[in-house]
Design a protein with these regions (language model features):
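Generic N-terminal helix/loop capping motif
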Residues: 1, 5, 28, 130-137
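Carboxylate- and glycine-rich phosphate/diphosphate-binding segment that chelates Mg2+/Mn2+
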Residues: 80-150
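Glycine/threonine-rich beta-strand-loop-alpha-helix active-site module
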Residues: 3-13, 17-109
C-alpha cells in the first residue's frame, strides 16, 4: 500500500508491533523488497568485529516514520525491527540506524484506550529488558537478577 500510494511519510499509532512493522516497510520501500522471501536480502550480517549490522549495499530508508506509541514497548527508540518469518514461524530482527522514527509523539491521552493488561505487560517487559542489560553491564548484578526473576 505504501508503495502504491507513493507515501512520503509513514505514521503509526499503536504498540511495538505496529512500530516495528513500519520500520520494516521503510527498508522494504528503500530496497525494492516486494515479497516475503526477498526480506532475506536485508537480514543482518555479522561484521568483522562480530557485531550484527545491515548487509553491504542496503539502502537507508527514504520515507520517514512518525510514531505515536500507545504502549511501553519503546520500539520507537530502537534501530531494530522484529518481523515474523511465517515460513519458519520465528521472529527475526532487521537492523539499520535509519529506521528509528524521525518523530515520536508521547501523548498520555492516546494511551487511555490501551487495555490495562497490555499496558502493564509492556511495562514489565521493559523492566525485564532493563535488568538484563544492567546485569550484562555489571556482572555482580547477575545474582540479584536471578534471585528476583527466579
Amino acid at each position: 500500500m505504501a508503495r502504491d500510494a507513493k507515501a512520503d511519510l509513514i505514521v503509526t499509532v499503536g504498540g511495538g508491533s505496529i512500530t516495528d512493522g513500519a520500520k520494516a516497510v521503510q527498508l522494504c520501500l528503500a530496497n525494492d523488497i516486494t515479497s516475503t522471501e526477498a526480506i532475506d536480502d536485508i537480514r543482518p550480517v555479522k561484521g568483522a568485529d562480530g557485531s550484527l549490522g545491515p548487509p553491504p549495499g542496503m539502502k537507508p530508508p527514504a520515507v520517514p516514520q512518525l510514531t505515536v506509541p500507545t504502549t511501553l514497548s519503546a520500539g520507537e527508540f530502537s534501530a531494530i525491527s522484529g518481523v515474523t518469518d511465517e515460513r519458519y514461524r520465528v521472529k527475526e530482527l532487521i537492523r539499520h540506524p535509519g529506521i528509528i522514527p524521525r518523530a515520536v509523539v508521547l501523548d498520555p491521552a492516546v494511551t487511555v484506550h490501551t487495555p490495562e493488561w497490555l499496558w502493564l505487560s509492556t511495562g514489565s517487559g521493559q523492566s525485564t529488558t532493563a535488568s538484563r542489560a544492567s546485569a550484562r553491564a555489571r556482572p555482580i548484578l547477575t545474582g540479584m537478577r536471578r534471585h528476583c526473576t527466579g
